[in-house]
């Protein structure tokens, strides 16, 4: 218990004693004293103690505070007037108290004030690859003969004897020997040392391990000069500090002329029984009083019942030390730590979740943050690989995409195609015969264009009658379509390279749809699909724009952009463009002898062009609306208009638990109530956030409400069954065939003469193969053997007859892969800029591929140098340096090397390039793999070279875990690099922002470096 706590208890005793006397009846007879303190009617400060007195009360500031009681302010024990609180290194003031901390490389002593050296070599060899040597306040790594210490000061580089002058032991360098481009050697010093005038020796400075001093250090021309706190004296070794009483005894014993003189002094001290003798028996602090000695303990310790001994307080036992997550007790203090995925805030108590989704390049598609972690998801048609990346799924590699005939893979999807003379079935998988030349002319209209005048202004409408699709691209961009393009147009190419969508002997002209594309502009409006208010959506007598043809497909793509007006002070305007594509079909049944097919087509084309002219005027005046399921939507919003009925979410979304979520599959967004409504029976919806449901292929209206895909529509044949149209009545797949999907018109043969045990099977696994293949293999129905999946494919299941292609441009290291995680991107990652950039191993943060080789070149602009930060690197040491990252001046093995490693290091390191340009190479062998690396860099003005090197070479930058986390925090590194690359950007960050971003010790370290750089002479 500290002295401040003792004073606190004394104040409590005084207050209780005063109250007891009043209860005992002291005072004037009959007088009733009012206890303002207990009634709370006093006006004492919150940091004061209320002491009741006869007829009044007193306010006494609590220990650690000063003032007259009604106003109390904290005493800053760390000020010079209080001798830094008795702390030999750093003093941190806290309300009503203070706390001592030590420089990196030291730990707090039992007295809570002194600082003792930490032997870093005891913990994982100090991170040194070979030899670790402890020193006062620091440590240093050394290498065995034939090795050089790399610039990260931990790893050792081995070089051959050829052309290496530094291999000569007589090179004369005290610390580091470097090869120069012109030949010969140049000496350098370890961090915290200055190169002497002879350019060979190294002079220790206070930047390295506090200059070897236990307390204070001051740089002089001859090296560090050590000093001690006022209660201590410098030991004869010139570095260590001892208490003055102890030092006085040592000096007096040294100067004693006789044993008798010493005996007299000892006897006198024993008789006096004061703190001068054996510190009064106190473990820590001793104070002489009228009744004898009184022992006390520093902050972080408590006095034991013997009144002499001090015991460390385990702060972690009381409310976990105030730490959010982990609490680690230390001698006289404690430290807080956080779980993985969290960071410690600058109050050194609170843990905050790291929002990885706020970082750049975290996920390719969708990022979902969660406490302590995050998850990457991919959009439909893509699959996850390498932890965060999304690659297109090649559905055609999985049993031909279940297509009956041809399969064409596309980005995020795929299409089944049919041979000439056949068309796609409604299930988009099977091919059926075309019903003559007029099959397309019988297609019903999917949309309708109409206009009507309101108040002299013509309003035009696009009414979606059938299938609609809404795809929001951003806050100011979306795509809306009605109908299905080219419903019967997907065909397989002929042998001569052409394709056909009609039956034999039919002309293409009557059945080919008319397609027209147009671009419209809306001034001073932003793309925002919004339900139109009921007051504005009045009944209007409308007339169709196209009465001689069917509109089978319309798509509207709306995107907005800012366009600056003329004049410097003119604000920019919002300009929106709508790109529309129309697909119409003639009403061939209206053909006559006076106007046959060609004539009808020409009239339809003229009608479509005339309709586009009318639409251009309507859209330009923002009088164009889209109608879906009875709800009218405005396609764009003018800034002056208030967004009515939007709530806080966009179209297709509703508010749930404070978040905007899209309407789920099986539902659609109804703009009138602004809610998600279930699909009615006979319709389905397999996508999120849509404005309508798609009619089921069956016209009978079967199926349950809320169908989430076409397979949930009623009346379809179940898996293992088929029919001519895919609807009931159905028959079972014959023996030797199977069908895994509903609503199909046929079954797939097992192949190779294989049979099934019974009819109605739904999987190839039901085929009686002669061998049951394990994952990583597929069954060959020709040879009846299990074949390993080739490189670039995988198979996670048993008994399959195919392998799945790796997503995107990824591949596998070997054949026989069993999981998509084995698929790796072979591309060497990174972005190389003049001021900032990064390099990363292929497939990062997933494991890099085997036999990879990457080369990067960093060439900064003139008069700029390169600073590199390696937050962490994962290279398996089991490979015996088969995977290597090297940075040097050029591709020549003899050029100046800046960094080289073949090991895993989770401790970050920062260093400057030894050459103006960098050639970087990463190579991996065929053995073990690892996560690899993502290494950022920044180029800075060479005038700051001395300052930057002084910072990155100071061991204090890496000793603290808080400092290490800074070099791993992508947001903080980005902020630091922003200022280093462009110093004027420093003024973007306020002092408060800096305090909230960085720990106090880190700011103090940088401030001292910058001050020394700007004012080198005192």
UniProtKB/Swiss-Prot annotation:
Gene designation per UniProt: Scube1
Keywords recorded for this protein, A-Z: Calcium, Cell membrane, Disulfide bond, EGF-like domain, Glycoprotein, Membrane, Repeat, Secreted, Signal
Biological function: Could function as an adhesive molecule and its matrix bound and soluble fragments may play a critical role in vascular biology.
Upregulation: Down-regulated by inflammatory cytokines.
Region of interest (Disordered), ranges: 493-512
Disulfide bonds: 37-50, 44-59, 61-72, 78-91, 87-100, 102-115, 121-132, 128-141, 316-327, 323-336, 338-351, 357-367, 363-376, 378-390, 396-407, 403-416, 828-854, 881-902
Signal sequence residues: 1-20
Subcellular location as annotated: Secreted; Cell membrane
CC annotations in GO: cell surface; external side of plasma membrane; extracellular space
InterPro entries referenced in this protein's UniProt entry, alphabetically: cEGF (IPR026823), CUB_dom (IPR000859), EGF-like_Ca-bd_dom (IPR001881), EGF-like_dom (IPR000742), EGF-type_Asp/Asn_hydroxyl_site (IPR000152), EGF_Ca-bd_CS (IPR018097), EGF_dom (IPR024731), Growth_fac_rcpt_cys_sf (IPR009030)
GO biological process terms, semicolon-separated: positive regulation of smoothened signaling pathway
Glycosylation site residues: 255, 400, 496, 709, 780, 809, 819
EGF-like domain residues: 33-73, 74-116, 117-153, 166-202, 206-241, 275-310, 312-352, 353-391, 392-428
Modification after translation: N-glycosylated. Could be proteolytically cleaved to release a smaller active fragment.
Protein name: Signal peptide, CUB and EGF-like domain-containing protein 1
Pfam families associated with the record: cEGF, CUB, EGF_3, EGF_CA, Ephrin_rec_like, FXa_inhibition
Domain CUB: 828-940
GO molecular function: calcium ion binding; identical protein binding
Provenance organism: Mus musculus
Subunit structure as annotated in this protein's UniProt entry: Forms homooligomers and heterooligomers with SCUBE2 and SCUBE3.
Biased composition (Polar residues): 496-512
Topology of this chain in the membrane: Peripheral membrane protein
